[in-house]
Amino acid sequence: MSSFDPPNHRYSALVLILLLLGFSVAAADDVSWTEDSSLESPGCTNKFQMVKVLNWVDGVEGDFLTGLTAQFGAALPSVPDQALRFPAAFVDPLDSCSHLSSRLDGHIALSIRGNCAFTEKAKHAEAAGASALLVINDKEDLDEMGCMEKDTSLNVSIPVLMISKSSGDALNKSMVDNKNVELLLYAPKRPAVDLTAGLLLLMAVGTVVVASLWSELTDPDQANESYSILAKDVSSAGTRKDDPEKEILDISVTGAVFFIVTASIFLLLLFYFMSSWFVWVLTIFFCIGGMQGMHNIIMAVILRKCRHLARKSVKLPLLGTMSVLSLLVNIVCLAFAVFWFIKRHTSYSWVGQDILGICLMITALQVVRLPNIKVATVLLCCAFVYDIFWVFISPLIFHESVMIVVAQGDSSTGESIPMLLRIPRFFDPWGGYDMIGFGDILFPGLLISFASRYDKIKKRVISNGYFLWLTIGYGIGLLLTYLGLYLMDGHGQPALLYIVPCTLGLAVILGLVRGELKELWNYGIEESESHTPEDPMPVA
C-alpha cells in the first residue's frame, strides 16, 4: 500500500466523509398517512385510499391536493372522467358535530377536525344534502378515520376523506376572499408492478459490478499482470502488495466499528440540525466528490485506448503539473457539477444526481477496501444493526424514523441530502421517487469487490468463485427490499436487513461448503502482522 500524495489523500478524506453520510434506506418519496388500529363493523370496512383533490378557483385549476378516504362512506371513482365537480362550502357549525344550519345540496362540505366522532360529522353532512365531506386535519399528517365501538351498523352513502391542515388553509383563503372554489375527487389506482424500482435495482447492481471489475474494464492487460504478481505474493509470502501508484485504504476491525458509530452521530446531527445551510455544505461536498469521481472515470475510459493523449502537460498555479487532457476533463466535470447544483430542484435533476453519485461510488470502491471476511463480517453486521435501528426502532425513541426523515430532507426549504440514487415513478399517477441510499450500494459493494479480487488472485472460474454468486445474492436482496416496500405500502425499508443475509450470509455458507472459510476469514492477515514502521498504516 503506497504512501499518500497530498491531492489523493485529501480526496480519500472526502470519500470517507461522504461514505459516513451514505444512508442505508430504500424508500418511496411519496404521500403517506399515520396508521391507527381501526375497528371494523358493518358499513365500516372500506380500505383506506389516497385521493386526488382537483381544485379550481374562479375557474382556474390549481395544484391537486391529497386526501385519505375514511373506513366508511361511498367509494370514489378511480379516474377523473367518472368523477363529478362540485362547489365547496364550509359547514355551520364548523366541526359538523350537530345539525347543520343550512342545506348543502350539490356542494362538497368542508369541516374541521375535533369535538365528535368522524362518523357523526359524516351523518350530519349527509343529512344536509352534501355530496361529500372533507375533514380538515389539525396537522400536516393524514390520519385514518375509522369507526367507534358503538357504530355497530353504519350507513353513510357519501364519500368522506381527510385533507391536511395546509390544504384546508389554502381552500379557506380562497373562500374567505369570496372566490368560487370547485372540487373534484377521485382515487387513482397504483400500478401493481413498479417498473422504475427495477431500473433502480439495475443501477445499484450495475454500479457494484462495474466498480468490482473496473481494472479489467479499463486496463485488462495491466490488471492481469497485477493479479498474477499478487497471486505469487500471496502463495509465497501470504501478503498482498497493491499497485504502488494506486492509493488503497484497507478498513480494519476497529475502523469498521468506528465507522458505524460515527455514521450514527452524523445521522443524529442531521436529524436535529437539518437546515438549508447544513444541506448546502453537504451538497457541495457531494458535488466535489462526484466531480472528481467523474474525472477519474472519464480519464480511465479515454486512456484505455488513447494513452498518448495524456503526454502533453501544463504547469498551473496551486495545482502543479497536470496533463492537458486532465485539465479539460476537469473543466467539463466542474461545469456538469455546477449545472446540477444550480438546477437541483428541477424535475430532471435526478439524472445529474444519479450520474454524480454513481461516479462517486465507483471511485470510492476503488479507494476503500475490505481485506478479508473477518472485517466484512464486523462491518456488515454493524451496518445491519445500524440500519434496522435507525429505520424501525428509532421511532420508539425519537417519535420518527430518523433515517427516513433525514433521507427525505427538509420539506420547508425543499432541500434534501443528495447521498442517494433516485428515479421518478413514471407510471404512477401519484408520482414521487423510488430511492436507495448510498450505504445500500457501498456496504455490499465492498464485500463483492473483495470477492472479485479474491477470485482473480485464485484464478477461479466465474461459476466456481464468489463474485458471481454474491452479485446474484445482492440482486435478490434488493428484490426482497422492494417487496417489503410494496407490502408495507411504501414505508421506508432498512435495505441491509435483506441485503446482508443475501451477500455476507451467502459468502459464509459458500466458504463453509468449499472448506475455504478460514482462508477467507484471515486472508491477508499476515500483511498486518509483518507491518513495519516504514510501511503506510492501513486506515483505522
From Swiss-Prot:
It holds the Pfam family Peptidase_A22B. GO terms for cellular component: endosome; endosome membrane; plant-type vacuole. A motif (PAL) lies at residues 494-496. The PAL motif is required for normal active site conformation. Ubiquitous. Belongs to the peptidase A22B family. The keyword Membrane applies. It is found in: Endosome membrane. The active site is at D387, D440. It is an enzyme of class 3 (hydrolase). Residues 1-28 form the signal peptide. PANTHER family: SIGNAL PEPTIDE PEPTIDASE (PTHR12174), SIGNAL PEPTIDE PEPTIDASE-LIKE 3 (PTHR12174:SF90). Keywords: Endosome, Glycoprotein, Hydrolase, Membrane, Protease, Signal, Transmembrane, Transmembrane helix. The chain crosses the membrane at residues 195-215, 251-273, 277-299, 322-342, 348-368, 378-398, 430-450, 467-487, 493-513. Its main location: membrane. Residues 216-250, 300-321, 369-377, 451-466, 514-540 are cytoplasmic. One of its GO terms (biological process) is proteolysis. Glycosylated. Intramembrane-cleaving aspartic protease (I-CLiP) that cleaves type II membrane signal peptides in the hydrophobic plane of the membrane. SUPFAM superfamilies: PA domain. Its EC number is 3.4.23.-. GO terms for molecular function: aspartic endopeptidase activity, intramembrane cleaving. This is Signal peptide peptidase-like 3. The keyword Cytoplasm does not apply. It is a multi-pass membrane protein.
